[in-house]
Design a protein with these regions (language model features):
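Helical scaffold of the NTase/Pol beta-like nucleotidyltransferase catalytic core
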Residues: 2-48
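Conserved NTP/Mg2+-binding pocket subregion across the NTase superfamily
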Residues: 14-23, 87-201
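Alpha-helical initiation/capping and key positions within long helical/coiled-coil segments
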Residues: 26, 185, 208-211, 215
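Catalytic metal-binding acidic patch
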Residues: 51-85, 100-116
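Amphipathic alpha-helices that form helix-helix packing interfaces
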Residues: 189-193, 197, 209, 216, ...
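Short helix-adjacent coil turns
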Residues: 201-208
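Short, charge-rich amphipathic alpha-helical segments embedded
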Residues: 211, 218-231
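Short, charged amphipathic alpha-helical segments flanked by flexible coils
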Residues: 229-242
Length: 242
């Protein structure tokens, strides 16, 4: 066990112990050690693994999607001091989508560590599941991410409580809102994607055609998952999953 793991308070379950209990496929030893160090930071409330590593669909090219739920930000210097022990390539503090450290482990496997404020994330999921807020595509992705993640560390049980809160049947009002909003974007109103695609095609604007077609498909799959009362898994393997 790493030194960080030894610092766990008495009676507290470590990452290496908890991963077997939670059903997570066996992780590389260095990943386990890395996550034990992150979980030892006082700012860390919970750690979970998501994506194909959590659902059992990982292949040789699959990276690690790690979600660190914090009460306040862990200092970049502290994160770097942990990650440099296990990663040959590090990009600390990327903010292209969420707050992330994007790295490559010493064994060549990529690992994305996403940091989320626990309360903010819970509010975002509640806005969809309980307040029925539909988006232009990908509406239920965060909900899906929560209910399918595997918890590795949960200091006060807050993440498990959140999973239980949102482990509910697909709300019919939300389903209707997703279909209504995204169906209009496919066709039938002035800004609909089909009209924009035709206009771009008439101009032979290949970049615009590609962009509008991508948005069309985002709304199209959002409708399909809603119709089937399935949470949206993201942008990968959509044809086989819907």
């Amino acid at each position: 066990m790493s030194e960080a793991g030894k610092k766990q308070t008495e009676g507290e379950t470590t990452i290496s112990e908890n991963r077997a209990l939670s059903g997570v496929p066996v992780m590389e030893r260095e990943v386990t050690a890395l996550l034990e160090e992150i979980s030892s930071c006082p700012e860390t409330a919970a750690v979970a693994v998501g994506g194909s590593r959590a659902t059992g669909k990982a292949d040789k090219k699959s990276d690690y999607d790690i979600y660190v739920y914090v009460e306040m930000e862990i200092a970049k210097e502290r994160r770097k001091s942990i990650l440099e022990k296990y990663c040959g390539v590090m990009e600390i503090g990327n903010h292209y989508w969420e707050s992330e450290d994007n790295c490559t482990l010493n064994n060549g496997v990529d690992i994305d560590i996403i940091y989320r404020k626990l309360q903010d994330f819970e509010g975002d999921v509640a806005a969809v599941v309980e307040q029925y807020r539909a988006s232009n595509g990908y509406t239920t992705c965060m909900w899906h991410n929560l209910v399918t993640c595997r918890i590795l560390y949960d200091r006060d049980g807050a993440l498990e409580a959140m999973k239980k809160r949102f482990d509910v049947p697909y709300p019919e009002v939300l389903r209707a809102e997703i279909i209504r909003k995204n169906r209009a974007l496919l066709s039938g109103v002035l800004p609909s994607y089909d009209a924009q695609i035709r206009k771009a095609a008439s101009r032979r604007d290949l970049v615009s055609i590609n962009h509008r077609t991508t948005e069309f498909l985002a709304s199209y799959f959002d409708i399909l998952f809603a119709m089937n009362r399935q949470t949206h898994p993201g942008e990968k393997r959509l044809v086989s999953l819907c």
